[in-house]
Amino acid sequence: MADILTQIVQTKTEAVTAARLRVPEAELKAMAGDRDSKRPFAENLRQVHAQGGTGIIAEIKRASPSRGIIQADLDPADCAAKYEAGGAAAISVLTDAPYFKGSLSDLKQARKACSLPVLRKEFILSDYQVYESAAAGADAVLLIVRILTQTMLSDLIGLCRALGLDTLVEIHDENDLETATNAGAKLIGINNRDLKTFKTDIAVATRLVSNFGPDQVPVAASGIGSREDIERTKAAGIYNFLIGESLVRAEDTVSFLKQLLTT
């Protein structure tokens, strides 16, 4: 890790320490056990992959370190409803506050406004955050290989499984893929953006997918903003995509999403 990623992890570590003082982990565990029925995040994407269709995880994203403010007055509920109307397979919600201006409130509002499964996109480093995700109603969580050891990743995947949470494990290179595979990851997001430099190249996904096992389902993330990008990536055997900025910036979200899904 280096630069912005190191900074994000440090900030997140401090935030979790503070959160533990406000809400004890035992309280979150109890809340996690009382959450609403789970929606099928991983299964939706597996079906798309098996059928060779096109699945889009539509992201609710207010800002990012690389792009700054994308849409300051974004309404999570309205956004989620439009994503569902446009044909998204699932929704991703950024909940990091310092760097992405998101929150767990955004996730709760989005999930309440639609019937789609919702992914919590966060820099998860601890069991505490997994319990927090389940308590907030998330159906799945993002686990980023770059900020976890293999043991941490394996343990977090196991905890998520025990809580009924699906996991999307994010990688960027061959070493990440090896770590994810050894940890038992089946649904794997290939981030075309290098989290160290924030440079984006959609060829990253088309290159790495050739190393996937037959039981692993790839999801391409970052840099996918057009039908051409999707077709190029599908040609390599990737049928699911996580798309954020281009959807948030679209003048007509529903029409743009339907256009991306048009075969």
From Swiss-Prot:
Gene3D superfamilies: Aldolase class I. Coiled coil: none annotated. Its EC number is 4.1.1.48. It comes from the Bacteria. One of its GO terms (molecular function) is indole-3-glycerol-phosphate synthase activity. The keyword Amino-acid biosynthesis applies. It holds the Pfam family IGPS. InterPro entries: Aldolase_TIM, Indole-3-glycerol_P_synth, Indole-3-glycerol_P_synth_dom, Indole-3-GlycerolPSynthase_CS, RibuloseP-bd_barrel. Pathway: Amino-acid biosynthesis; L-tryptophan biosynthesis; L-tryptophan from chorismate: step 4/5. Keywords: Amino-acid biosynthesis, Aromatic amino acid biosynthesis, Decarboxylase, Lyase, Tryptophan biosynthesis. GO terms for biological process: L-tryptophan biosynthetic process. It catalyses: 1-(2-carboxyphenylamino)-1-deoxy-D-ribulose 5-phosphate + H(+) = (1S,2R)-1-C-(indol-3-yl)glycerol 3-phosphate + CO2 + H2O. The keyword Transcription does not apply. Belongs to the TrpC family. HAMAP family: IGPS_B. This is Indole-3-glycerol phosphate synthase. The gene is trpC.
